[in-house]
Amino acid sequence: MKIKSVELVKTIYKSNDKYPESLNGEFVFVGRSNVGKSTLLNILTGRNIAKTSKKPGKTASINFYKINNSFYFVDLPGYGYAKVSVEERARWRKIIENYFSKRAWNIKLVFVLIDGRHELQKNDEILLEWLKELELDFAIVMTKMDKLKNSERAKMIRYYKDLYGENYTIIPYSAITREGIDKIYELIEIFGGV
C-alpha cells in the first residue's frame, strides 16, 4: 500500500462538532495515553502529521486525516491519563463515545494500541468489550515490543493471543524497528483502504 496524499480535514473537540463528509471508510487508532498512536500514524503516512510528545495526553481531539482522497485515518484522544482534569477526561470520553456511536457505520477497522510490555489494563478491556458489543472489527497492536527481551516478548504475545487471538488479529509492533508496519498496511488493504 502506498500513501500518496494526507490531509488533516477535521478536528473534533466537542461531542456536538460536525463530522466530515463520509468517504470510503475510516480506520481508527485508539489506545491509552502515550501508547504511540501519533507515532504510528506518522510512520504509516511517512509524514509528521500527528504531534508526538513524551508527555501523555498530547492528542486532545479527534483528528480526521484524509488518505489518498479515499478514506480516513482517525486519531482518537488517549484514555487513562490521570494528570488531566476530571472535566477534560470526561470531555475526551464523551467525544470518543459519541464518535463510535455516530460513525460505527463507516468504520472499517479499529486499531487498538496496547503497550505490549504489560498485561491488559482495565480501560483497554472495557474498550475491547465495547467494540465487540458495537460489532466493530478490531486488531490489537502491541506497541513498544523492541523494549522486551525475546522470552518476555514471546510470553506477552502468547498472553494476548490467548485472550483475543482466535477471533482478532494481534500485531507485535515497534516504532524503532518498524516491525508490524507491513501487517497494518495489509489489514488496511484487506478492509478496503485503497
UniProtKB/Swiss-Prot annotation:
Any Pfam family the entry gives: MMR_HSR1
Keyword Ligase part of the UniProt annotation: no
Keywords noted in UniProt: Cell cycle, Cell division, GTP-binding, Magnesium, Metal-binding, Nucleotide-binding, Septation
Gene3D superfamilies membership: P-loop containing nucleotide triphosphate hydrolases
Binding site for Mg(2+): 38, 59
Residues at which GTP binds: 31-38, 57-61, 75-78, 143-146, 173-175
GO cellular component assignments: cytosol
Keyword GTP-binding attributed: yes
Cofactor annotation: Mg(2+)
GO terms under biological process: division septum assembly
Residue span(s) of domain EngB-type G: 23-194
GO MF: GTP binding; metal ion binding
Job description of the protein: Necessary for normal cell division and for the maintenance of normal septation.
Family, per entry: Belongs to the TRAFAC class TrmE-Era-EngA-EngB-Septin-like GTPase superfamily. EngB GTPase family.
Protein name per Swiss-Prot or TrEMBL: Probable GTP-binding protein EngB
Gene that specifies this protein: engB
